């Protein structure tokens, strides 16, 4: 069985371009059409509706790195990994850790655009950055990541950035309108903010990590986006929230710790404004917005962005300060 990304046929080509851009498309297998949907074969998991399906082999050489491993190691090597620019980022179990060098070399030889492999040891510190150890290639965590027509350069060991949110960033970009006032409350290297500012939205980006400010400014310049409608505030959001104005849209991309800030930030939302809340939640748990906010708020959209563990998922919740019809989808 092979992991596939399921998308409507109408979005097949733009999805293919995205998967090729982030090197997630498994060219060893063919896409499968099924009841108005296209199933794209994956090298590694991305956000969206992921299903396991028998792959349809292509005549091209497969880039599944595990096929180059001895059978004993192949069984315990991770299927999924992230790619940030030219860096592959993997998590290893205790069982597979002793084979890290062999696994890393197989990743390098199977992905020609990857020149470094980093071991992900979890998230550390108040700046929620990855605890990384380079296990193959030059010990340099700076790379340039391309997505949705933008380039983001940063040190992935010093600034928060999730390659798996590329389609989510595109979704929010498509929803936004020129002139909107937007608060990016946990900005990191500002991938949301750069794209939205390029569309003419007025952005206030906030992050307490000084490295985030450095790389955010760099990414605005790198993408030729004017800073005339962009302000970066290097601070903890709780220290400045009372002084902030109101916004049409608020981004809360702090999956491990968003909920404690939801109530205070909700007071900074205009009528008919939207909060995009990213939160890791137990798969069996149902999110009830009234457990956190008043009756004037409603969750109008939710979906799984990607699995986080066997028991939990990263989900996005669009919270409207008004009334609307609730919809839920994994597409």
Where are these predicted regions, by residue range?
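SAM-dependent transferase fold signal centered on methyltransferase-like domains
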Residues: 1-331
């Amino acid at each position: 069985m092979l992991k596939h990304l399921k998308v409507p046929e109408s979005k097949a080509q733009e999805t293919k371009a995205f998967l090729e851009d982030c090197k997630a498309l498994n060219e060893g297998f063919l896409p499968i059409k099924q009841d108005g949907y296209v199933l794209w074969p994956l090298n590694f998991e991305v956000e969206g509706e992921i299903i396991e399906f028998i792959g349809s082999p292509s005549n091209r050489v497969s880039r599944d790195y595990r096929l180059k491993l001895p059978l004993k190691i192949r069984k315990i090597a991770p299927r999924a990994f992230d790619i940030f620019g030219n860096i592959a980022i993997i998590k290893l179990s205790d069982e597979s850790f002793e084979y890290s060098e062999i696994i890393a070399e197989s990743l390098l030889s199977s992905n020609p655009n990857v020149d470094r492999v980093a071991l992900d040891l979890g998230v550390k510190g108040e700046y929620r950055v990855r605890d990384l150890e380079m296990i193959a290639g030059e010990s340099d965590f700076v790379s340039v990541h391309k997505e949705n027509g933008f380039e983001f350069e940063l040190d992935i060991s010093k600034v928060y950035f999730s390659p798996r949110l590329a389609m989510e960033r595109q979704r929010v970009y498509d929803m936004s309108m020129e002139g909107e006032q937007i608060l990016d409350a946990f900005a990191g290297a500002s991938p949301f903010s750069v794209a939205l500012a390029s569309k003419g939205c007025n952005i206030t980006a906030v992050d307490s990590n000084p490295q985030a400010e450095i790389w955010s400014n760099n990414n605005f310049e790198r993408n030729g986006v004017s800073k005339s409608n962009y302000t970066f505030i290097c601070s903890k959001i709780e220290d400045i929230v009372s002084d902030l104005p109101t916004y049409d849209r608020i981004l809360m991309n702090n999956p491990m710790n968003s909920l404690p800030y939801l109530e205070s930030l909700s007071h900074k939302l205009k009528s008919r404004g939207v909060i995009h809340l990213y939160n890791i939640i137990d798969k069996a748990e149902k999110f009830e917005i009234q457990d956190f906010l008043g009756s004037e708020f409603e969750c109008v959209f939710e979906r799984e962005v990607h699995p986080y563990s066997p028991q939990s998922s990263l989900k996005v919740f669009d919270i409207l300060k008004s009334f609307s019809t609730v919809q839920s989808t994994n597409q």
